[in-house]
Amino acid sequence: LRNSLARFNPQAAERVLYLTHWDTRPGADNEVNPADQLRPIDGANDAASGVGLFVALADALQKKPSSLGVDLLFVDGEDYGDFGPPLVDVMLGSTYFAAHLPEPGYRPLFGVLFDMIGDADLRIPQEINSVQRAPEVVQRVWSKAAEMGRGDVFVPREGQAITDDHIPLLDAGLKVIDVIDLDYGPGNSYHHTLQDTMDKISARSLKIVGDVALALLR
């Protein structure tokens, strides 16, 4: 397992942390056929959408740097094991990062986890753990999206509580929220299945999320 951290403007004291997981599910456990459940998923949305977003953000930040320090963290092992309960071998990379921060006293102004943001029918509600534990970051992100006319995607209503890579960071005292659309496909029928493929991904959805993510850094 391996995390990767890309740091822009590394000397800046004021920093923003963006993270995404780059691993994909080793088995398609939501498939009906037991044989298919043993096959790894492509993870076009559940992993690769966040990675693609970060590649585009890195390119934009290289061309027009932010005055803020920006940390793009790719974490491994989010989807490796069993979400239970109990949790077994999941969120491994984010848990490691939370215990081994880049420097003593590392406290970014805010952090955002981007997960499953490539769905063609993208609707991102406010994840409950984020609302309860980092409401000021939720307000910052959703206000910026509304200001940009993207309230149709960043929906101003509470969703469900999701166990994801922001939890270990919240537990470590960092203010990190989860930007995620867990409703993937009709009746969530693509999540953790062999249907999580590139034909389900929308360039428009990725651009909307990317525009908001970049605007938060300006």
Residue map of PLM features:
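Acidic/histidine-rich catalytic neighborhood of metal-dependent amide-processing enzymes
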Residues: 38-136, 144, 161
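Active-site-proximal beta-strand/loop segments in catalytic clefts of secreted hydrolases
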Residues: 8-10, 19-23, 57-58, 73-78, ...
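A non-catalytic alpha/beta surface segment that caps or lines the substrate-entry region
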Residues: 1-11
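Short, conserved acidic/polar surface loops in the N-terminal third of protein domains
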Residues: 17, 28-31, 83-85
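Envelope-exposed proteins and targeting segments
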Residues: 2, 14, 68-71
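Glycine/charged-rich beta-loop-alpha catalytic/anionic-binding loops adjacent to active sites
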Residues: 29-40
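Active-site-adjacent substrate-binding region
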Residues: 110, 117-218
